[in-house]
């Protein structure tokens, strides 16, 4: 995706996701806030990957705080899995919380509609649309 020359790459949403930028705040508190906003929309956290700790442990590289949250709405996941059993290959929805270069925080959301376009199943597409709406409400609640 091309970006305008005056817009940093980190501020241009990729075609496979969307994000919001939070002001500088404690990373742990931001994780709690993001998790609570997801819960309000029916999502639970199935996985949490601490990328910063993993890079330090495996490669000896110090990096900024970076977490990948595997978010799942059980009702919607059940609908998608019932419509297409192998859709689990594309689940759960990843939400990234990371520190930006300026010290603020970026919360990125996988766009389920973009990801689920790999299937032509209309029920999966309908579920993906509903998931996107809920994730966009999470983004709005955080902004």
How should each PLM-predicted stretch be described?
Residues 2-41:
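Terminal, regulation- and interaction-focused segments at domain boundaries
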Residues 14-16, 65, 91, 103:
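A generic structural signal for well-ordered coil/turn residues at beta-strand boundaries
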Residues 31, 73, 132-135:
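Short amphipathic alpha-helical/adjacent loop interface patches that line ligand
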Residues 35, 52-53, 136:
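Short glycine-/small-residue-rich flexible loop motifs, especially phosphate/cofactor-binding loops
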Residues 40, 57-58, 141:
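Residues at alpha-helix termini
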Residues 44-96:
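Compact, glycine-rich, soluble single-domain proteins
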Residues 96-120:
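Beta-strand/loop substructures that line and gate deep hydrophobic ligand-binding cavities in soluble
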Residues 117-143:
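Well-ordered alpha/beta subsegment
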């Amino acid at each position: 995706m091309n970006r305008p020359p005056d817009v940093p790459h980190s501020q241009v949403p990729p075609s496979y996701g969307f994000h919001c930028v939070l002001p500088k705040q404690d990373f742990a508190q931001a994780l709690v806030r993001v998790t609570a906003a997801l819960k309000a929309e029916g999502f639970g956290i199935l996985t949490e990957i601490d990328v910063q700790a993993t890079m330090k442990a495996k490669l000896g590289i110090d990096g900024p705080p970076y977490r990948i949250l595997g978010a799942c709405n059980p009702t919607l996941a059940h609908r998608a899995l019932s419509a297409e059993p192998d859709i689990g290959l594309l689940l759960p929805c990843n939400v990234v919380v990371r520190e930006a270069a300026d010290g603020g925080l970026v919360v990125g959301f996988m766009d389920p509609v973009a990801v689920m376009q790999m299937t032509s199943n209309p029920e999966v597409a309908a579920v993906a649309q509903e998931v996107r709406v809920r994730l966009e409400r999470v983004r709005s609640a955080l902004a």
